[in-house]
UniProtKB/Swiss-Prot annotation:
Keywords: Cell membrane, Membrane, Protein transport, Signal, Transmembrane, Transmembrane helix, Transport. GO terms for biological process: clathrin-dependent endocytosis; nephrocyte filtration; protein localization; protein transport; receptor-mediated endocytosis; renal protein absorption. Residues 451-482 are annotated as: Disordered. Residues 1-20 form the signal peptide. Required in the nephrocyte for normal uptake of proteins and elimination of toxins, and for maintenance of endocytic trafficking structures. May function together with Cubn. This is Protein amnionless.
Amino acid sequence: MGLHWQWLIWALVGLHVALATKWYGGGMDFNDPTAWLDDHLPCAQDLVVFPEYYPALLPLPEDISIDGLVFPREGAILLAEESTITFGSDKQPSCESDENKAYLKPPKSSKWFDPGTWTDKSKEFSTFTPELERIPCDDEQVIIKGHGPLAFDLENVQYLRLGQLILAGSSISKTYLEQLISRDLGQFLFYNAEYVQVEYYRGELCGCHKDFERLLEPVCHNVQEQCETPHCLSPVRPLGSCCLICGAILSTPTTHCTEGSRKELVAQISNLISQESLKDQIGLHVEFVGSQKFGNCLQAVVTDRHKYSERSLEFLQQNEHNWNKTGTTLKVSGRPYNPNVSFSSIVLILFCMALVGLVSVVILAHFMPENPYLNRIPQWIHDPRLWRWRHLGLRLRRNLLFNRFDNGGAEGGSSEGGASGVDRLGIMAYDPESGEVRERAFDNPMFEQGGALEEAAKESQEQDEILSVPKMETGDLDARSVVDEQELTEINLETCEADTDEETI
């Protein structure tokens, strides 16, 4: 009886290992138009031309019909046992080309520790699934299939740990994989594989990886830029995850990583979610996490499926008594918030709204002068006396720029030297035709009154008459004129002396 139970346990373990499979279907397939230049698939009369340097392994399809192959200087192709290549077949009217050549595009490599390289057909990865569970686990089966170029970058890979490797339909053993990596063919299939050690495991591990903390840095190096900013305060990071999330984490230490204990916790939490009708609102992920340094634990990640609203946090806190065990820890994130909206952005938005409102009011005041409230705004803008903020120490210049345009002859004006544009600001212009005093304009210095024009014309005429008087002729004085001048001077002196004597008497 005990023997039957032992066989049953091993069968269940084998079933679990078989279901845990990572698939690689990346690369552009040989029969995909995107793998060729100008999206031109090779016809039966076409010559297939490889790039000069083709750093990849290309598995050719089982049956192709072409005119020939131009191999690269460096590269590799893989032919299956049942593959058939037909050269020089008949032309097909539906497939013709002018050049009779088809050019393959250069291949692209995929990183082994990149979660985007692998898929799991047995389950769908959610946004809160740890990144270390999206790459091949240490005991998982890895299937590499397809007819596209194969090239894997083993950057930061120290141990290539697998459960089983199936390449192009063939199972690859640990010994053959070690030999393949060291050969020339393996250098096209695996980059940076000089010091990589190959290890195979068969389900004897706890969790996805043997030491998850050693893989965090190389794996997160490939996905760190893809992490979204969490919309909550104090986000949490599950074990084996590179990105912070909003939700709750329930961790229970364990010594035996059995599938039964994991399913028991999954069923317990799922039943509570169904009882509260939260299946469409709350997401759940339960998995073992193993570490030689920190020990093993069973981790349950509970998050909101849609926008974070603390529903997952409330659910775990309300039902905490259902799984209250020794050593169980609960980590929760804070309240939701939008990280894209900060205090400075709010202030900027309010300032822009106030500025738009102010400009709108000024425009309305300009086009609605009859409004009893809006018509005061232009006066407030043009009146500098309202701009004196004594408590700020600001003063307005008294020598205004347009003082020379003030009408000094208008009524109410001041012609005294002490007057200024600020004192006579009520009168800024005078309209000579209507006799109105304009308070929102200035005099045009080129515009004069009628009387002023006549007076200016009269002054101009008098000046012309003065300029028209003939000038006196001048010439050199001769000796006779000099003698006459001396005689006149003597007569004047004698007359002055006689007058002086009479005054003395």
